Amino acid sequence: YTWAESDSQYIDSFTNDQAANIDLTLKHYDSNASTENQPTSDNVYLDGLKYHTPDYSKSNGTSVIDFPMHWNFSNASNAFTRACQEDPYYNDASWNVTYVDSHDYGPDMNSRYDGGTQAWAENLDVLFTFRGIPCLYYGSELEFQKGVPMDVGPNAPLSTTGRAYFGDYLEGDVTATDFGTYTNASGAVASTLEAPLAVHIQQLNRIRRAVPALQKGQYTRSNTYVDGNMAFV
């Protein structure tokens, strides 16, 4: 998804013929359905323990939401492992937007995340300290609507789903001064900001802002330097 097209038959090949465009799209999908013969990159990896300048000469200039990683957030270890497996196939996975849940998936197909506060905290640790750009879905800092159906279309009020209105939790006043730093909170938003996961996110934000390598860095899992299931530098 992040590579410049290298096959001339797919470059600037769309026409006003809708059927032909669909056929071309399906052909392109089928021809790239596996990682075999696909380009790989070391842009996201350290050279030993040293940063190296990424080579973007074959990049198409876009990045993606990291759906494979998201889909494996049944626990932090699974998500981390899946991300490491996929990273060579992105031009630079440090640009991937990483997330646990969304308006569609929690990350399962049925309900908002209900793995517990401790598991949520570990998931957030991965999002804010591993490669990628962390993204939070509204309400997750409170485990909002945990366990309820994500979306059932017209078959139930939104208030009973994962897409329920969250604004009530944000009523009041607060003055934000920096990432994870605020003063003068009052009303419902004060309680929201004091929730365990909200406090954890504030702390992770401050750590990430203080360490440039966590914001946009490279990593290594070489056993020369680290040892452990989720260990990296």
Each PLM stretch: what is its role?
Residues Y1-D92, N96, G115-T117, N123-V126, ...:
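Active-site-proximal helices and loops of the catalytic beta/alpha 8
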Residues T98-Y99, I133:
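Catalytic-domain carbohydrate-binding cleft regions of carbohydrate-active enzymes
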Residues V100-P107:
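Active-site neighborhood of divalent metal-dependent phosphoester/pyrophosphate hydrolases
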Residues S102, C135-Y138:
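Glycine-rich, aromatic-lined ligand/substrate-binding cores of catalytic
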Residues P107, R131-P134, R208-Q215:
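Alpha-helix capping/termination and helix-coil
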Residues M109-D114:
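Short, solvent-exposed helix-loop connector elements
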Residues R131, Y138, L142:
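Short glycine-rich loop/turn motifs that provide flexible caps or phosphate-binding loops at active sites
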